[in-house]
C-alpha cells in the first residue's frame, strides 16, 4: 500500500498534465471492427425497441415527450385513491405542474419494477451508444487510435474532448478499447467511493469511518444507519394523572391526548422484516411524568407484521439527560433490536444521489425534491447532524462570506473559485473544490507512484500507464509477463501499487479488473444501468 504523507508528498499537477497529454498523443486504441459491430447492434436494438413501444404501450415515438407523458399520466390515473402512486410521486412535480421522463425518474421506476421505464432507458441507451460508437469510429485515425485533447478544470480534474471520453459510459468504453500493442492485456484499477471518502476523511467524520470499511458497501451502510428501525416515546410533562406508561385504551378514555401521540407508526423504510415477514406497523409509547423525574420506559414494544401477527421486540431508548429537567413535553427515540433490514437498489441509488448533493451544499428543500422514494428530510437531518460535516459546511460558508475566492485541498493546493452567480452558488463551489481538487492531487501522486514502483520492482519492461479516467487508472501489461504471471498475482501487484492511505485516513479501497479484449458481443435486454462511476 502507498502511504502518503500530506505534509511531505506534494502533488505535481504539471507532471500529471504532461504525462496524460503524452498518452493521448500516442493515442487510445479502438477495436474498430468491434466498435462498428456494436454500433450496428445498438442501431438494430433501437429500432426493435421502438417497435415494441408502439405494440406494448401505444407510443409510436419514444423520442416524443408528449407521448411519453400521456402514457405515464394515463397509467397514474388508473391507480386507486389511497394506493401509493409511484408514477405520480416520481414523475410529477406538484409545484410546477410538470411531468418528467428524465433518466433519474425512469431509473427509480425501473428499480421498482416498471418495465416501461426500463424499456425507455434501454431505448435511450441504445441510441446514445450507437451515436457514441459512431463518434469513436469517426475520430479514430488509420491505425484505430483516437487522440483526445486534454484540459484541466478549475479543480485540476482532467477533461477530454474530440472525442469526449468522459461522457462515454464506462462499460461501453472498456468494451471497445484495446491494448496499444497486440497481445497485451489491459487492467482497470478503480478507486472506490473516492469523493465521499475524501469528504469523510477530510472532515474527520468518525461516525462514518465504519461505513467506509463495511463489507455491505458505503451507501448501504449509511442508509441502514439513517433509516435504522426505531420507535418513539412521547413524555407528557405534568399532563397525565400518574407518572407511568399509559396504554392506548387508557389514553382513548381520557380523551385529552391527541391520537397522533399514541398511534402506531410505519417503519422508516420498506424492507424491514422479522423472521422473513415484513413489518407493517410499530407500537409507540406515551408516558406521563413530572418535571425533573426520569420516565421508566418498557424494554420491549410490539410490532405488527404483514400477516397481522404481533410480536415483541427489544428496544433501547436514547438518554433523556438533556430533556427531563425541562417543563416542556419531549420525545425519545427507541432503537429496535431483532429487525432485519434490506436496502433496495432504488433506495440505495436515491440515498447516494441525495448524499452527494448534500456534500456540495444542497438545501433541505433540494434534498426533499430529489427524494421520491425515501424520506429526504430524514436524509438531510442525518447527514447535517454529523458534527464534523456540520462544522465543515459552517466553516466553508463563513469562509466564503468573508470574501475569500481561493481554497486549498488536503495537500494545500490552492484553487480559485472563479465567477459565481450568487453567494449560495459560491458556497456550493467552495464545498466542492477541496473534494475534487484533492482527487486530482491524488491522481497526480499515483501517476508518480506508478513510475517509481515499476522501476523499483523491475517491472518497467512489463507494464505501462495506458489511460486515466476519473478515479481510475488503466494499465497495459505486456503479453510475455501475462504468460508467466498468474492473473491474481498481477491483481495483487496493481493493488499494492495503487491502493493508498493518506496520513491516518481510512485506507482507500481499489478494485482491479481485467478488461475484455475479445470480439464477442453478449448484451441482454435491461442493459441500461445508472452511471457506473
Give short role names for the model-derived ranges.
Residues 1-174, 183-185, 192-195, 205, ...:
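Conserved "right-hand" nucleotidyltransferase catalytic core of DNA-directed polymerases
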Residues 22-44, 273, 366, 371, ...:
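Catalytic palm subdomain of template-directed nucleic-acid polymerases
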Residues 299, 303, 326-343:
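Append "Rare intracellular matches occur via the same short Y/T/C beta-strand/loop motifs
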Residues 2-4, 26, 39-66, 384-397, ...:
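Polymerase palm active-site segment centered on the conserved acidic dipeptide of motif C
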Residues 25, 146, 229-275, 344-468, ...:
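Conserved catalytic core of nucleic-acid polymerases
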Residues 267, 271-309:
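Solvent-exposed, low-complexity, repeat-rich "mucin-like" stalks and linkers
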Residues 147-254, 346:
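Function-dense linear segments that define catalytic or interfacial modules
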Residues 108, 133-139, 171, 188, ...:
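Short, contiguous acidic/charged loop-to-helix segments that flank catalytic cores in large enzymes
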Amino acid at each position: 500500500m502507498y502511504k502518503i504523507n500530506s505534509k511531505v508528498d506534494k502533488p505535481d499537477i504539471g507532471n500529471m498534465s504532461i504525462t496524460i497529454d503524452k498518452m493521448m498523443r500516442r493515442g487510445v486504441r479502438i477495436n474498430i471492427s468491434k466498435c462498428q459491430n456494436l454500433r450496428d447492434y445498438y442501431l438494430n436494438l433501437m429500432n426493435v425497441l421502438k417497435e415494441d413501444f408502439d405494440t406494448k404501450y401505444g407510443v409510436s415515438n419514444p423520442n416524443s415527450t408528449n407521448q411519453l407523458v400521456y402514457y405515464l399520466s394515463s397509467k397514474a390515473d388508473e391507480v386507486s385513491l389511497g394506493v401509493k402512486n409511484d408514477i405520480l410521486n416520481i414523475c410529477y412535480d406538484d409545484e410546477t405542474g410538470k411531468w418528467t421522463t428524465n433518466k433519474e425518474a425512469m431509473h427509480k421506476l425501473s428499480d421498482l419494477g416498471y418495465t416501461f421505464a426500463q424499456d425507455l432507458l434501454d431505448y435511450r441507451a441504445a441510441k446514445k451508444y450507437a451515436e457514441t460508437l459512431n463518434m469513436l469510429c469517426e475520430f479514430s485515425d488509420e491505425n484505430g487510435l483516437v487522440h483526445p485533447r486534454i484540459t484541466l478544470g478549475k479543480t485540476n480534474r482532467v477533461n477530454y474532448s474530440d472525442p469526449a471520453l468522459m461522457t462515454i459510459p464506462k462499460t461501453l468504453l472498456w468494451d471497445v478499447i484495446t491494448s496499444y500493442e497486440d497481445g497485451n492485456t489491459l487492467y482497470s484499477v478503480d478507486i472506490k467511493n473516492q469523493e465521499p471518502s475524501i469528504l469523510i476523511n477530510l472532515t474527520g467524520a468518525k461516525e462514518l469511518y465504519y461505513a467506509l470499511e463495511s463489507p455491505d458497501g458505503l451507501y448501504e451502510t449509511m442508509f441502514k444507519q439513517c433509516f435504522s428501525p426505531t420507535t418513539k416515546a412521547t413524555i407528557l410533562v405534568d399532563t397525565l394523572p400518574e407518572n407511568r406508561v399509559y396504554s392506548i385504551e387508557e389514553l382513548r378514555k381520557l380523551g385529552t391526548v391527541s391520537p397522533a401521540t399514541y398511534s402506531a407508526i410505519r417503519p422508516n423504510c420498506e424492507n424491514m422484516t422479522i423472521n422473513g415477514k415484513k413489518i407493517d406497523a410499530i407500537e409507540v409509547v406515551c408516558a406521563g411524568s413530572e418535571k425533573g423525574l426520569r420516565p421508566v420506559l418498557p424494554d420491549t414494544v410490539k410490532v405488527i407484521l404483514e400477516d397481522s401477527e404481533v410480536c415483541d421486540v427489544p428496544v433501547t431508548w436514547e438518554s433523556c439527560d438533556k430533556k427531563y429537567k425541562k417543563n416542556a413535553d419531549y420525545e425519545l427515540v427507541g432503537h429496535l433490536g431483532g429487525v432485519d433490514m434490506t436496502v433496495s437498489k432504488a433506495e440505495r441509488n436515491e440515498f447516494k444521489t441525495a448524499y452527494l448533493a448534500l456534500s456540495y451544499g444542497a438545501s433541505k428543500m433540494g434534498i426533499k425534491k430529489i427524494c421520491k422514494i425515501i424520506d429526504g428530510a430524514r436524509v438531510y437531518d442525518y447527514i447535517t447532524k454529523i458534527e464534523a460535516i456540520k462544522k465543515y459546511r459552517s466553516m466553508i460558508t463563513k469562509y466564503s462570506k468573508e470574501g475569500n475566492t481561493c481554497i486549498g485541498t488536503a495537500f494545500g493546493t490552492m484553487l480559485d473559485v472563479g465567477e459565481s452567480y450568487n453567494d449560495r452558488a459560491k458556497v456550493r463551489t467552495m464545498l466542492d473544490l477541496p473534494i475534487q481538487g484533492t482527487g486530482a492531487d491524488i491522481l497526480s501522486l499515483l501517476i508518480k507512484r506508478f513510475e517509481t514502483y515499476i522501476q523499483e520492482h523491475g517491472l518497467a519492461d512489463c507494464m505501462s500507464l495506458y489511460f486515466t479516467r476519473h478515479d481510475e487508472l488503466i494499465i497495459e501489461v505486456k503479453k510475455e509477463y501475462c504468460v508467466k504471471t498468474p492473473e491474481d498475482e498481477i491483481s495483487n501487484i496493481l493493488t499494492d501499487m495503487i491502493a493508498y492511505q493518506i496520513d491516518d485516513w481510512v485506507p482507500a479501497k481499489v478494485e482491479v479488473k481485467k478488461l475484455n479484449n475479445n470480439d464477442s458481443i453478449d448484451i441482454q435486454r435491461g442493459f441500461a444501468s445508472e452511471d457506473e462511476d
